[in-house]
């Protein structure tokens, strides 16, 4: 299901340069195929805005090569933005009010950079709740990433996330816990997912309100769960959209914070991510940093080019299969009129018919 470059969003050109299939609008118009319209609520901070576009759009684009995708990025006006990001948004992003009028088949909601002790005090809170209230009535399925999952589980069911007291950071092994669900069809029974968070929502409070857990890790906890109707909302605590280098970039950011004094302790390595040789290189880099800091010298160059060939990606293939499953089900269930969430005869409280099948 290739993306259609229906706007001049620079991410389309970046993906084409990577070898991704991105159709021109003229070419797509010649194909007699009902395109799928997917909203993309990007709440990430300015520095990660474009990278987050690429990560999620890449997964959507690789999910299938038959249908067409029109991606509609939008954001919330309450999020603080610099001039450059604001100009990017003004030029390339849709307005939520327009999307409400035009309709969407599916919606992806990114995480965000936490700025307040409590989620309800975050600048995105009211706007996010408004978007989801509309989506629950008008969108076939909504996929929520990390902090968005935490916020919406709290908003919808009053479940507050649990502080871990440390950062769950690295790549962890997971297992499918509900193999009969079509969203995990053809996924490996065990696979890896990156995590990067200080908080967690556990299985027990989710199950108490009817949320079903699909994927879980003995070490990292719940990764994927679905709303009680089993499809209309999909929650993720992990980051299957991450690039191979994403955790390394986070590590680089943290060691820079230590060097400039905004972090007290030197950061640990992300778990299960770096090979021994990569750790040895980074330990040498730490010694260089410590010496430079003692002598009042500039931050030494980070050895990213040396490290890149040593990084493995053990999660991307599974992420592609999941996105294929999710988008395929949206395509099967959505109405031909994208202002309506389902085709005639689909039960909104059990769109997959799975609750009835399983006797839930």
Swiss-Prot record:
What Gene Ontology cellular-component terms does the record carry?
cytoplasm
Where located? Cytoplasm
Q: Active site at which residues?
A: 146 (acyl-thioester intermediate), 239 (proton acceptor), 241
Which residues does the annotation list for site: Important for acyl-CoA specificity? Answer: 113, 115, 147
Q: Carries keyword Signal? A: no
Q: Where is this site: Important for substrate specificity?
A: 196
Give the catalytic activity: L-homoserine + succinyl-CoA = O-succinyl-L-homoserine + CoA
**What GO terms are given for molecular function?**
homoserine O-acetyltransferase activity; homoserine O-succinyltransferase activity
Pathway listed for it is: Amino-acid biosynthesis; L-methionine biosynthesis via de novo pathway; O-succinyl-L-homoserine from L-homoserine: step 1/1
Write out the GO biological process terms.
Answer: methionine biosynthetic process
Q: Which NCBIfam families match?
A: PRK05368.1-3
Name of the protein described by the UniProt record: Homoserine O-succinyltransferase
């Amino acid at each position: 299901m290739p993306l259609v470059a229906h706007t001049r969003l620079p991410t389309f050109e970046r993906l084409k340069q990577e070898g991704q299939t991105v159709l021109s609008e003229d070419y797509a118009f010649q194909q007699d195929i009902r395109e799928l319209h997917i909203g993309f609520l990007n709440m990430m901070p300015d520095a990660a805005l474009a990278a987050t576009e690429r990560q999620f759009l890449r997964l959507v684009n690789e999910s299938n090569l038959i249908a067409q995708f029109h991606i509609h990025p939008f954001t919330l006006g309450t999020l603080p933005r610099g001039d450059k990001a604001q100009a990017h948004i003004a030029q390339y992003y849709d307005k939520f009010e327009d999307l409400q009028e035009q309709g969407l088949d599916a919606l992806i909601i990114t995480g965000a950079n936490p700025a307040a002790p409590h989620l309800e005090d975050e600048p995105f809170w009211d706007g996010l709740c408004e978007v989801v209230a509309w989506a629950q009535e008008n969108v076939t399925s909504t996929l929520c990433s990390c902090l968005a999952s935490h916020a919406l589980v709290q908003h919808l069911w009053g479940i507050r996330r649990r502080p871990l007291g440390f950062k769950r950071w690295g790549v962890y092994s997971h297992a499918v816990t509900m193999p009969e669900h079509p969203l995990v069809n053809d996924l490996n029974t065990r696979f890896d997912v990156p995590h990067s968070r200080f908080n967690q929502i556990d299985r027990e409070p989710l199950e108490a309100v009817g949320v079903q857990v699909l994927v879980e890790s003995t070490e990292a906890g719940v990764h994927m769960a679905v709303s009680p109707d089993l499809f209309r909302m999909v929650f993720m605590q992990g980051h299957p959209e991450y690039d191979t280098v994403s955790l390394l970039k986070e590590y680089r950011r943290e060691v820079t914070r230590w060097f400039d004094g905004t972090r007290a302790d030197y950061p640990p390595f992300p778990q299960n991510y770096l090979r021994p040789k990569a750790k040895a290189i980074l330990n040498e880099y730490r010694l260089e940093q410590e010496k430079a800091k003692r002598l009042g010298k500039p931050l030494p160059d980070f050895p990213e080019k040396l490290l890149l060939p040593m990084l493995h990606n053990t999660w991307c293939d599974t992420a592609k299969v999941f996105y294929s499953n999710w988008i395929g089900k949206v395509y099967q269930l959505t109405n031909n009129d994208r202002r309506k969430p389902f085709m005639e005869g689909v039960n909104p409280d059990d769109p997959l018919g799975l609750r009835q099948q399983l006797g839930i």
